[in-house]
Regions:
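Detector for outer-membrane/organellar transmembrane beta-barrel domains
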Residues: 82, 111-129, 134-210
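Outer-membrane beta-barrel "beta-signal"
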Residues: 253-269
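Structural signature of outer-membrane beta-barrel domains
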Residues: 20-26, 80-86, 124-128, 164-168, ...
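Surface-exposed beta-loop-beta
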Residues: 34-139
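Residues on the lipid-exposed face of transmembrane beta-strands in outer-membrane beta-barrel proteins
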Residues: 1-6, 64-68, 77, 106-110, ...
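Outer-membrane beta-barrel translocator domains and adjoining extracellular loop/strand segments
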Residues: 28-34, 87-94, 129-136, 168-176, ...
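Repeated loop/turn-to-beta-strand initiation elements of outer-membrane beta-barrel proteins
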Residues: 10-15, 72-75, 114-118, 154-158, ...
Length: 269
């Protein structure tokens, strides 16, 4: 487990500071279990993604969050300094690379009518400040707005719109070795979700659908969990990826669609 130091102090804004002594990447698809799209091959590949040690940062990560409640609205300002959590960049030899990343943003959550509304904004500032290096992700502006409410007893629904804007897009396309596979200048994703509880809340049904009109792809996820006692639980579900193009965010994983089932028994300590 990673060691994280935290500090906090109460004043006009509450402050939370986190320091990760050494960069910790996310677990992503690397060809071990699912294939992914490789623009250099112009097709999906199941070859294991190998990241050389020199392309793996060992420097610290820093994160800070300032937050408070104002007139029923939870406001937060946050920042991060570290590296991309997935190896989205490449070195001059085409090998995967974690590039520098600084993120600043804010969020707001408050009751809206019978439900809860949320708003988020973030600016991703990377190494490629003018878009001329196609091996490094461009700076991005990200925006999210969502709403969730209980429709009837035990049935909750939510909707969300998320967008990414790639800065200096024309410059990137002009310098790219494979412009036909580059992400769009503006990517939109609409998310809908339903959550239903039954049988005295021992049965939980959960459905998500992520759909991108700009990429014309999406991801449908369904999960059912039944926990009649504290001793055991059975669950099952489906992950369905769909899309017309093999290089888009969800479309590249179409062949990775799956169904699953699990049983858990909890032993007394």
């Amino acid at each position: 487990p990673a060691e994280i130091s935290k500090g906090g102090k109460d004043f006009e804004f509450e402050v939370s500071v986190e320091v990760m002594p050494e960069f910790e990447p996310d677990n992503g698809i690397n060809g071990e279990y699912f294939s992914y799209f490789n623009p250099m091959l112009a097709e999906n590949t199941g070859a294991r993604m190998v990241i050389p040690d020199e392309n793996k940062p060992d420097d610290p990560e820093y994160a800070m969050r300032l937050y408070r409640s104002v007139a029923g609205t939870e406001l937060a300002i946050y920042g991060y300094k570290g590296f991309t959590k997935l190896p989205e960049a490449a070195d001059e030899l085409g090998r995967p690379l974690y590039s520098d990343l600084t993120v600043t943003g804010f969020s707001a959550i408050r009751p809206v009518g019978p439900g809860i509304g949320k708003l988020e904004y973030a600016f991703h500032d990377g190494d490629d400040t003018d878009g001329s290096n196609p091996l490094i992700p461009n700076d991005q502006t990200r925006f999210l707005i969502g709403y969730e409410q209980e429709l009837v007893a035990n049935l909750t629904a939510g909707v969300q719109w998320y967008t990414e804007f790639n800065h200096d897009f024309d410059v990137r396309i002009a310098n790219s070795s494979w412009p036909q596979f580059e992400a769009t200048e503006r990517r939109h994703v609409f998310t809908t979700q339903l959550r239903y509880q039954a049988l005295q809340q021992t049965l939980v049904l959960h459905a998500f659908n992520f759909w991108s009109p700009t990429d014309d792809d999406g991801f449908l996820r369904f999960r059912a969990t039944y926990s009649p006692t504290d001793k055991w639980q059975v669950s099952g579900g489906m992950n369905l990826f769909y899309g017309d193009e093999a290089h888009t965010f969800y479309g590249q994983f179409e062949d990775a669609s799956n169904v699953y089932a699990s049983f858990r028994y909890f032993f007394e300590g």
